[in-house]
Curated annotation (Swiss-Prot):
Induction: By D-xylose, L-arabinose or L-arabitol.
Protein family according to the UniProt entry: Belongs to the FGGY kinase family.
Identification of the protein by name: Probable D-xylulose kinase A
Residues annotated as binding ATP: W366, G471, G472, N475
Catalytic activity reported: D-xylulose + ATP = D-xylulose 5-phosphate + ADP + H(+)
UniProt gene name: xkiA
Role played: Highly specific D-xylulose kinase which participates in the catabolism of xylose. Xylose is a major component of hemicelluloses such as xylan. Most fungi utilize D-xylose via three enzymatic reactions, xylose reductase (XR), xylitol dehydrogenase (XDH), and xylulokinase, to form xylulose 5-phosphate, which enters pentose phosphate pathway.
Keyword Glycosyltransferase: no
The enzyme's E.C. designation: 2.7.1.17
Organism of this sequence: Neosartorya fischeri (strain ATCC 1020 / DSM 3700 / CBS 544.65 / FGSC A1164 / JCM 1740 / NRRL 181 / WB 181) (Aspergillus fischerianus)
Molecular-function annotations in GO: ATP binding; D-xylulokinase activity
Lineage: Eukaryota, Fungi, Dikarya, Ascomycota, Pezizomycotina
Pfam families in the cross-refs: FGGY_C, FGGY_N
GO cellular component: cytosol
Amino acid sequence: MTSQGPLYIGFDLSTQQLKGLVVNSELKVVHVSKFDFDADSHGFSIKKGVLTNEAEHEVFAPVALWLQALDGVLDGLRKQGLDFSRVKGISGAGQQHGSVYWGENAESLLKSLDSSKSLEEQLSGAFSHPFSPNWQDASTQKECDEFDAFLGGPEQLAEATGSKAHHRFTGPQILRMQRKYPEVYRKTARISLVSSFLASLLLGYIAPMDISDVCGMNLWDIKKGAYNEKLLGLCAGPFGAEDLKRKLGDVPEDGGLRLGKINRYFVERYGFSSNCEILPSTGDNPATILALPLRPSDAMVSLGTSTTFLMSTPSYKPDPATHFFNHPTTPGLYMFMLCYKNGGLAREHVRDAINEKSGSGASQSWESFDKIMLETPPMGQKTESGPMKMGLFFPRPEIVPNVRSGQWRFTYDPASDTLTETEDGWNKPSDEARAIVESQMLSLRLRSRGLTQSPGDGLPPQPRRVYLVGGGSKNKAIAKVAGEILGGSDGVYKLDVGDNACALGAAYKAVWAIERKPGQTFEDLIGQRWREEEFIEKIADGYQKGVFEKYGKAVEGFERMEQQVLKQEAARK
């Protein structure tokens, strides 16, 4: 590469910071600039990037903060010596579901920016509402209940929009805004998602929403490829569905569409080329699957404090417990997502109990946990026909399935299909080392059932690869059990892109959009250039004949166990 080759920027506008990451055509990172909202901003009384109103469970961010941040990140890149004139394309990733409310004067302000002044100075008056609801906001229970009931139940809402109603989703948030602040809503000319807000600043006029991020609203009918008219009507109330449709704008199907050239402001202030193209910005989760690139039927498991499971799949099989989005770049594929509240904490509870029993007390070492887990046979079965031990371990209330915090232990006999809630035969805490990891992985396998294909060679349907990210991905014993349960004909891999996944995915999206040949998919172009040895390491085998099938039987018992616990909990209320 000559040092004059094209460059591309991927932005990541998250809850606590804005990051700008620059790559070249070969996907090599050449610059990264960050603006930490708490540390680097001035004039906002935020904490961890947000403001809260606990009385109403509201969590929101001042939109002007993000204006300050964009100038801050670009200043940072300038100080690092970035030659802005080489930047050919820009895309971004935004925290999902958040909404920005533009006033009637927004487009005229965006078009007439003076490059000698900051964005914040000139655009603070461009918004009909100064705040954007954050994904942590929980103020919309009433609205969620209405959304869930409106098409006949949460199943029907998930079938249409990919998800049941959630507090953070944009539709319920707009409904609450329209009722609580009708005058603000009336004066709102356009509504952006956080991702399309970012693209709008760069373009100089309101950018359309992205085909994947629009699926996080409970308003977009995924199969029909259009807004659901009934849900728009519910959301808009007395203002009418047509008015809301105008506020939201059209949604282009091509995730790599060239929306337009960069706003003159950035050409004059930073030295961008006037030919720099702005591409659709997507949501943070869709951007994450672009950082790999994740191929159809590959699975990505984030083993952090909570557990997140992401998969690219050609199958659309929505369920109230899961999320489906359009794939951000590839028509015919969907992004499947599962979010759990319990993850690392539940595993640490068992680890600590084991260390305490063995006398290593306050140690945070995983050595004893790992040793015991690997010595325990799958499902704790002492013999081939013996009972399987399984349980649910939730230190905090769970959403998948929707139950209170607690622990439940069962034995399951696959031969007679009998399930018994009992602690008999459980050697606590030792048996729980394997049981906690199995419980978490069996839930993933249960809910991704039917989304995978056979990788060939007569193998049963399973992911081609399982990628692990987050703190838990460092643990090879957990990776081994994950592979035994989830499969992975090609193995289990640790993925390490630091905390840059969203920004990388956005930057790769820009490279693909500008450099693709006609009809060339993202997976093809990026797959050819991605140097996997820099980012991934194989840490465990995946599919093991016999063991994978045994866990297939365990999934049946696991599903019954969840249903029984849900029934018991419903009876308690």
